[in-house]
UniProtKB/Swiss-Prot annotation:
The keyword Repeat does not apply. Binds directly to 23S ribosomal RNA and is necessary for the in vitro assembly process of the 50S ribosomal subunit. It is not involved in the protein synthesizing functions of that subunit. One of its GO terms (biological process) is translation. One of its GO terms (molecular function) is structural constituent of ribosome. PANTHER family: 39S RIBOSOMAL PROTEIN L20. Keywords: Ribonucleoprotein, Ribosomal protein, RNA-binding, rRNA-binding. It comes from the Bacteria. CDD domains: Ribosomal_L20. Belongs to the bacterial ribosomal protein bL20 family. This is Large ribosomal subunit protein bL20. One of its GO terms (cellular component) is ribonucleoprotein complex.
């Protein structure tokens, strides 16, 4: 009796892995053994960087708030401290957005916080 090797499932599995490696350079995109390692590593980087992205954006928001605060005669740390003392809760993302899109409104916030 001939050996059944379930070629349909094997081909589907290989296609699924090769599909994840679309756009990879050279043998990293078309040789299965190399593709497996490349896709594994890519998924590790993706997992790590989904978490790092949160930290990166927070630091970007802080930089933007600090730059806008310095234009208004204070610093980020003094402003955040004053906001916490007055229990004004505006998150960093929103503050950074206001600082970039509406500097006049940000100036009013700074004046209200630092009196």
């Amino acid at each position: 009796m001939p050996k059944a090797n379930n070629a349909v499932a094997s081909r589907a599995r290989r296609k699924r892995i090769l599909k994840k490696a679309k756009g990879f350079w050279g043998s990293r995109g078309n040789i299965l053994t190399v593709v497996k390692h490349a896709v594994d590593k890519a998924e590790q980087y993706a997992y790590r960087d989904r978490r790092a992205k949160k930290r990166t954006f927070r630091s970007l928001w802080i930089m933007r708030i600090n730059a806008a605060a310095r234009l208004n005669g204070t610093t980020y740390s003094k402003m955040v401290n004053a906001m916490s003392k007055k229990s004004i809760e505006i998150d960093r993302k929103t503050l950074a957005e206001i600082a970039v899109k509406d500097p006049a409104a940000f100036s009013q916030i700074v004046k209200a916080v630092i009196e």
